């Protein structure tokens, strides 16, 4: 029983001995309304799956932090609450397929990228790289990494490596990735060698793809040129066949007479002159050959019909 009495009295003892009736009772520190709203938002997100309500609750919590800041509240508590609100809000936006709004939604509360918490920035990188849009966070993460105040954080090295793997390498920014790894003291020697090896592998793959595309382009160009040269005789032959068929659609005697008159007008030779006989003979042979070719062509067309 004695031990029970001493045990029950232990919580009421202060630093200077047992609590006297004349001493005032110390009140618990006031709790920020944003903490209650954070718990409510997390409950809406995880339990009720009401993503819109969870996002709205996070926004009300942010307003509460801006309007009702408690002077006795530790600064670290406020930062943790803000980071947790961002995590819940990012998850709610992603669940509603509004992931494109995540970066702008976060920056409206932190104003500048350099002030983003490492955990929030890591979630943004993960989300946008998973949705194959890493370029959206390229400038934001670059600004955060270049800020001297962030380079002393313990999360800096892991976040820089995550940025290289998820953003710079997929975008082909190999020089920027190599400069970041070599110039940063946050990388250990082993991690630096591993990341540089990954950059070297990505550069080799990029060169192979570039050379392969050039080799594939050359046969296509050669094929197009040869196709043009092959199509030219076919075009000439089609024009010739069209002209011959049009010519022989007229009566043969009328065509012969028209050609003879044309020759007389152009060449201007005398049909009665002996010197004109070879020309007339060649002209007659030409028309016989044309007539024979046309008749054989018409015969082939009839067979096909």
Swiss-Prot record:
<keyword id="KW-0812">Transmembrane</keyword>
<dbReference type="GO" id="GO:0044877">
    <property type="term" value="F:protein-containing complex binding"/>
</dbReference>
<keyword id="KW-0472">Membrane</keyword>
<comment type="similarity">
    <text>Belongs to the peroxin-26 family.</text>
</comment>
<feature type="region of interest" description="Disordered">
    <location>
        <begin position="1"/>
        <end position="25"/>
    </location>
</feature>
<comment type="function">
    <text>Peroxisomal docking factor that anchors PEX1 and PEX6 to peroxisome membranes. PEX26 is therefore required for the formation of the PEX1-PEX6 AAA ATPase complex, a complex that mediates the extraction of the PEX5 receptor from peroxisomal membrane.</text>
</comment>
<dbReference type="GO" id="GO:0022615">
    <property type="term" value="P:protein to membrane docking"/>
</dbReference>
<protein>
    <recommendedName>
        <fullName>Peroxisome assembly protein 26</fullName>
    </recommendedName>
</protein>
<keyword id="KW-0653">Protein transport</keyword>
<feature type="topological domain" description="Peroxisomal matrix">
    <location>
        <begin position="268"/>
        <end position="305"/>
    </location>
</feature>
<keyword id="KW-1133">Transmembrane helix</keyword>
<feature type="topological domain" description="Cytoplasmic">
    <location>
        <begin position="1"/>
        <end position="246"/>
    </location>
</feature>
<keyword id="KW-0576">Peroxisome</keyword>
<dbReference type="Pfam" id="PF07163">
    <property type="entry name" value="Pex26"/>
</dbReference>
<dbReference type="GO" id="GO:0016558">
    <property type="term" value="P:protein import into peroxisome matrix"/>
</dbReference>
<keyword id="KW-0813">Transport</keyword>
<feature type="transmembrane region" description="Helical; Signal-anchor for type II membrane protein">
    <location>
        <begin position="247"/>
        <end position="267"/>
    </location>
</feature>
<dbReference type="GO" id="GO:0005778">
    <property type="term" value="C:peroxisomal membrane"/>
</dbReference>
<dbReference type="GO" id="GO:0045046">
    <property type="term" value="P:protein import into peroxisome membrane"/>
</dbReference>
<dbReference type="GO" id="GO:0043495">
    <property type="term" value="F:protein-membrane adaptor activity"/>
</dbReference>
<keyword id="KW-0735">Signal-anchor</keyword>
<dbReference type="InterPro" id="IPR010797">
    <property type="entry name" value="Pex26"/>
</dbReference>
<comment type="subunit">
    <text>Interacts (via its cytoplasmic domain) with PEX6; interaction is direct and is ATP-dependent. Interacts with PEX1; interaction is indirect and is mediated via interaction with PEX6.</text>
</comment>
<dbReference type="GO" id="GO:0005777">
    <property type="term" value="C:peroxisome"/>
</dbReference>
<dbReference type="GO" id="GO:0051117">
    <property type="term" value="F:ATPase binding"/>
</dbReference>
């Amino acid at each position: 029983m004695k031990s029970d009495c001493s045990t029950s009295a232990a919580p009421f003892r202060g630093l200077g001995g047992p609590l006297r009736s004349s001493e005032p009772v110390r009140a618990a520190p006031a709790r920020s309304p944003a903490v209650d709203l954070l718990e409510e938002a997390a409950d809406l997100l995880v339990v009720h799956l009401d993503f819109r309500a969870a996002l709205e609750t996070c926004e009300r919590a942010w307003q509460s932090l801006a309007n009702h800041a408690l002077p006795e509240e530790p600064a670290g508590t406020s930062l943790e609450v803000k980071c947790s609100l961002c995590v819940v809000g990012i998850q709610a936006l992603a669940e509603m397929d509004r992931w494109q709004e995540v970066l702008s939604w976060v920056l409206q509360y932190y104003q500048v990228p350099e002030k983003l918490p490492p955990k929030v920035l890591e979630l943004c990188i993960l989300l946008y790289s998973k949705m194959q849009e890493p370029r959206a966070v390229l400038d934001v993460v670059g600004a955060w990494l270049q800020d001297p105040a962030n380079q002393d954080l313990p999360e800096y090295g892991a976040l820089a490596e995550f940025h290289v793997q998820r953003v710079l390498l997929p975008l082909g920014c190999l020089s920027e990735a190599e400069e970041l790894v070599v110039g940063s003291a946050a990388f250990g020697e082993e991690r630096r060698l591993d990341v540089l090896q990954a950059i070297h592998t990505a550069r080799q793959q990029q060169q192979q793809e570039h050379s392969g595309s050039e080799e594939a382009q050359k046969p296509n160009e050669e094929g197009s040129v040869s196709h043009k040269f092959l199509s030219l005789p076919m075009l000439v032959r089609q024009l010739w066949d069209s002209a011959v068929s049009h010519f022989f659609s007229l009566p043969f005697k009328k065509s012969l007479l028209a050609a003879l008159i044309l020759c007389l007008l152009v060449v201007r030779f005398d049909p009665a002159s002996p010197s004109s006989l070879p020309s007339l003979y060649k002209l007659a042979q030409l028309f016989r050959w044309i007539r024979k070719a046309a008749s054989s062509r018409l015969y082939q067309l009839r067979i096909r019909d």
